[in-house]
UniProtKB/Swiss-Prot annotation:
It comes from the Eukaryota. GO terms for biological process: Ras protein signal transduction. PANTHER family: GUANINE NUCLEOTIDE EXCHANGE FACTOR, RAS-GEF DOMAIN-CONTAINING FAMILY MEMBER 1B. Residues 76-206 form the N-terminal Ras-GEF domain. This is Ras-GEF domain-containing family member 1B-A.
Length: 514
């Protein structure tokens, strides 16, 4: 994971001919000066238990109006700013008179894994539920149990629906079964609710396992392009234009892949990708025994694959005219991705076209009409912290909010930049304050960013699937970086001594030629 993050955060989207994506040095420090304003869209839990009836919900007027502590929690302007870990855990647990705000539930379940394992949190929650509400007492007031049981079930339902991957841990499932058994005993209504929640969770985990198996199968079937070339004559090699010559159709199929892979990324993966040892924890790293961010990593690897596929398709053709045609085709595909709101595929295509083996093909580029490509590069220009892209992303997000069709709902962010933003938020602000309190102000902002992603990933792709095109995009052999350079030199010869030396070296090592 450390190597993965180093590679991801250390790369740069350069001028033509330089190496990948963006420099982290240009990233400004991310503070929390604007948190209160930004959090207006995130309703928060009232700072003390609020009485509500079965249908009336919260009394929204019962807020503290000044800075003060409340049972280990610190508020400012009605916003929860910090608190001890134990107080925050208690704040998560419903009582007869109180149910935590959904925003607080999501934020705490997301961020708590920086301090303790999810199974440890579940154990504490179960203990508080049983102990505080006397669920273990056979003489417990049944009316009281009937009041608290729906709220505990609702909390567990929100946990299993939003963070289902936590329950791949057998310890989580054990605690869940023990608590739900106490709640459902003797009440047929609660027993059905527990059964429905459990079945939904199992379906999600089964689907995840099937997705991971399919992904592993796809990855194992991918071979190096150069190896294929050695065994098959180039004349019978398939290329992208023989599979699909319509830019709009290809952009739609790319969007299918993007949305499918986005949908399997759990919100917790953004936190677990950067998790470090809590200074107040004497135990080992919380996630040393977890698959921390495998779906997130797989999605970043898809970006890299698409970039290399684009470069491979451009460098493959022998004829200059054909190479120019492929470049213009991908420019049109990139433009359609932009129109759809698929910024990740757009950036992957631009990255592939800016790789040195492609950008050095000057005779080929001379035959290309680059006006549309220049506009797309301008939209994704990394200067001013990707200002142009962020403006376009806000426009796509607004379009999604007011959408009249499923197509208008699509927002697929440039994913590596999203990860980078979250990384710098995490690195720029301490998890704990000097007094040992959890810095919850930081986690409101973290949750805000991840919540936006959660909205984007739930969109269903409205386009028809083309299995042949999808299969090609996912499994077509691609060149390695060295093979790309070799293909580039074979297409347009070396221009200086350094390139000549590299060409000879590559021919010797890759083709066993001198």
């Amino acid at each position: 994971m450390a190597k993965f993050l180093a590679e991801l955060l250390g790369c740069t989207l350069p001028e033509k001919g330089a190496s990948p994506m963006f420099e982290c040095r240009s990233q400004p420090h991310i503070g929390l000066r604007h948190v209160t304003k930004q959090r207006d869209k995130m309703p928060q839990t009232p700072p003390f238990p609020v009485m509500y009836g079965s249908t009336n919900g919260y009394n929204k007027n019962l807020y503290k109006a000044k800075e003060e502590d409340y049972e280990g929690l610190y508020y400012h302007d009605n916003n929860l700013i910090s608190g001890s870990l134990e107080a925050l855990i208690e704040h998560l647990v419903p009582t007869v008179a109180y149910y935590p705000d959904r925003t607080y539930i999501f934020t705490f379940l997301l961020s708590s894994r920086l301090f303790l394992h999810p199974y440890e949190l579940m154990s504490k929650v179960c203990h508080l539920c049983v102990d505080q509400q006397r669920l273990s007492d056979p003489q417990a007031d049944k009316a009281r149990v009937r009041k608290i049981a729906p709220k505990i079930l609702q909390l567990l339902t929100e946990w299993t629906e939003t963070f289902p991957y936590d329950f791949r841990d057998e310890r989580m499932m054990k605690s869940l079964k023990e608590l739900t058994h106490r709640l459902s005993t003797g009440e047929d209504l609660y027993r059905k609710a527990v059964q429905q929640m459990t079945q939904t969770l199992i379906r999600k985990l089964t689907t995840l396992s099937q997705y991971e198996e399919a992904l592993a199968k796809i990855n194992s079937s991918v071979t190096d392009r150069l190896t294929v070339l050695k065994t098959k004559p180039q004349s019978i090699q398939r290329d992208i234009l023989t599979i699909c010559n319509d830019p709009f159709t290809l952009a739609q199929q790319l969007t299918h892949i993007e949305l499918e892979r986005l949908s399997y990324i759990g919100p917790e993966e953004f936190v677990q990708a950067f998790v470090q040892k809590d200074p107040l924890d004497n135990d080992k790293n919380c996630f040393s025994d977890h698959k921390k961010a495998s779906n997130l990593e797989a999605y970043v690897e898809w970006f890299n694959r698409l970039s290399y596929l684009v470069a491979t398709e451009i460098c493959m053709p022998v004829k200059k005219k054909h190479r120019a045609r492929v470049i213009e085709f991908f420019i049109d595909v990139a433009r359609e991705c932009f129109n759809i709101g698929n910024f990740n595929s757009l950036m992957a295509i631009i990255t592939g076209m800016n790789m040195s083996p492609v950008s050095r093909l000057k005779k080929t580029w001379a035959k290309v009409k680059t006006a549309k490509f220049d506009i797309l590069e301008h939209q994704m220009d990394p200067s001013s912290n990707f200002y142009n892209y962020r403006t376009a992303l806000r426009g796509a997000t607004q379009r999604s909010i007011t959408a009249h069709s499923s197509r208008e709902k699509i927002v697929i962010p440039f994913f590596s930049l999203l990860i980078k933003d979250i990384y710098f938020l995490n690195e720029g602000c301490a998890n704990r304050l000097p007094n040992g309190h959890v810095n919850f102000e930081k986690f409101w902002e973290l949750a805000k960013q991840v919540t936006e992603f959660m909205t984007w990933k739930k969109v269903e792709c409205p386009f028809d699937r083309d299995r042949k095109i999808l299969q090609y995009l996912l499994t077509a052999p691609v060149f390695s970086e060295d093979a790309l350079y070799l293909a580039s030199y074979e297409s347009e010869g070396p221009e200086n001594n350094m390139e000549k030396d590299r060409w000879k070296s590559l021919r010797s090592s890759l083709l066993n030629r001198t």
